[in-house]
């Protein structure tokens, strides 16, 4: 099957009739050699690029086209931004201007390298049990080779076994960087208690913080119970004059360079003086708004995130109230602005209560537009209307985008 890619799917695959083609862009002429069925869709397994689209550029990474991390790396950056606007409008019906990332290379502050018998790296696109072994990653860090080399040294000196998809000792190497502080956190995620402490601290002697996280299940994700092996409990990131503390058990926005744009977008949509920040995490929005003079209450179910948020407030000498608990149980009365930044699944039924009890001004932050629009159409639209929206490209070279939507009571 040969033809011209006419557009992209909502998840960023090139569209050729009924076939979806990864790493293909509008204007490309491709020949599909073989396909596979996945979740009711036909996806090209093997294809040839017959003629390049004028919006195509060479990938910067030598693993591009195999590694599943950067689907759009072969697309001019301004075209990436245009497509993200188009997809958002197609999914939500809302027109929103996108703000690009100040940096599109070496911008990620976290990377999870899977450690396997077949190498250390990332999963191949569409092949969850095939690993692309890497020694560089131009969207993460210029020091990737250093991190991979240190991990290999540690495995070699201890004789610990990498993951083989059924069992093994070490499963993931998670690395976090403070892009504006230069600090580094290493987190080895393993199926055994801390082992080879001396070898670990020597191999990663350059790190400011070294953790070992015990993984008690065999799910293929970088999660475990962390134990500090060496160095500082936290690393720091500096954003807009604020110090954010980062811990292995907590989430932090992955693009430190675009984060100020996201923070300013939320601030520009906030009204009044009293703000309720639900799903507040480590206080990303709460701390920034408090610095800007708002009276902020953050609610977060992850108690470790609450602990880190409180410590960050102390470090920054800010008066912010962080409450541990489910966002769904929070009291919504008495605030002029409500911020919600739910997980990818969205608000679901909680949006019904927000529609009934929420304040005049609602700010919905979402990395999953399809879930936002469900929440809006099912419940929020009965009480709120969309007043403004902006997109922030926190994820260059991928189809993903962060949306900030301002809603006002009807």
From Swiss-Prot:
E.C. number: 2.1.1.189
Catalysed reactions, semicolon-separated: uridine(747) in 23S rRNA + S-adenosyl-L-methionine = 5-methyluridine(747) in 23S rRNA + S-adenosyl-L-homocysteine + H(+)
GO MF annotations, alphabetized: 4 iron, 4 sulfur cluster binding; metal ion binding; rRNA (uridine-C5-)-methyltransferase activity
Binding residues annotated for [4Fe-4S] cluster, in chain numbering: 61, 67, 70, 137
Signal peptide: none
Regulation: Activated by magnesium ions.
Residues holding S-adenosyl-L-methionine: 253, 279, 300, 341
Superkingdom field: Archaea
GO terms for biological process, alphabetical: rRNA methylation
Active-site annotation: 367
CDD domains reported for this sequence: AdoMet_MTases
Protein biosynthesis as UniProt keyword: no
Family annotation (NCBIfam families): rumA
Protein name as annotated: 23S rRNA (uracil(747)-C(5))-methyltransferase
Organism, scientific name: Pyrococcus abyssi (strain GE5 / Orsay)
């Amino acid at each position: 099957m040969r033809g011209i890619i006419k557009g992209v799917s909502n998840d960023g695959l090139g569209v050729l009739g009924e076939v979806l083609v990864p790493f293909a862009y509008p204007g490309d002429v491709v020949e599909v050699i073989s396909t596979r069925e996945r979740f009711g869709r036909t996806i090209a397994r093997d294809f040839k690029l017959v003629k390049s689209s004028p919006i195509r550029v060479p990938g910067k990474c030598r693993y591009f086209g195999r590694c599943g991390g950067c689907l759009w790396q072969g697309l001019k950056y301004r075209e990436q931004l245009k497509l993200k606007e188009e997809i958002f409008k197609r999914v939500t019906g809302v027109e929103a201007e996108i703000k690009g990332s100040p940096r599109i290379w070496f911008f990620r502050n976290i990377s999870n390298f899977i450690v396997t018998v077949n190498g250390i790296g990332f999963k191949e696109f569409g092949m969850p049990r095939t690993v692309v072994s890497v020694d560089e990653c131009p969207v993460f860090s210029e020091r990737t080779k250093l991190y991979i080399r240190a991990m290999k040294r540690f495995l070699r000196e201890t004789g610990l076994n990498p993951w083989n998809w059924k069992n093994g000792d070490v499963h993931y190497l998670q690395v976090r960087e403070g892009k504006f502080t230069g600090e580094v956190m290493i987190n080895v995620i393993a199926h055994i208690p801390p082992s080879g402490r001396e070898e670990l601290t020597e191999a990663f002697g350059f790190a400011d913080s070294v953790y070992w996280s015990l993984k008690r299940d065999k799910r293929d994700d970088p999660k475990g119970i962390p134990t500090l092996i060496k160095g500082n409990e936290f690393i720091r990131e500096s954003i807009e004059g604020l110090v954010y503390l980062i811990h292995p058990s907590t989430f932090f926005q992955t693009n430190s360079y675009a984060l100020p744009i996201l923070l300013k977008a939320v601030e520009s949509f906030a009204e009044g003086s009293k703000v309720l920040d639900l799903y507040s995490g480590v206080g990303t929005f709460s701390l920034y708004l408090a610095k800007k003079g708002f009276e902020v209450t953050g609610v977060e179910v992850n108690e470790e995130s609450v602990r880190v948020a409180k410590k960050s407030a102390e470090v920054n000498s800010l008066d912010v109230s962080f409450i541990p608990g489910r966002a769904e149980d929070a009291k919504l009365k008495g605030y002029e602005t409500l911020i919600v930044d739910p997980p990818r699944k969205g608000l679901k039924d909680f949006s019904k209560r927000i529609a009934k009890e929420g304040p005049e001004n609602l700010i919905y932050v979402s990395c999953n537009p399809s879930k936002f629009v469900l929440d809006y159409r099912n419940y929020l639209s009965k009480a709120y209307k969309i007043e403004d929206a902006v997109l922030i490209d926190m994820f260059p070279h991928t189809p993903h985008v962060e949306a900030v939507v301002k809603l006002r009571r009807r």
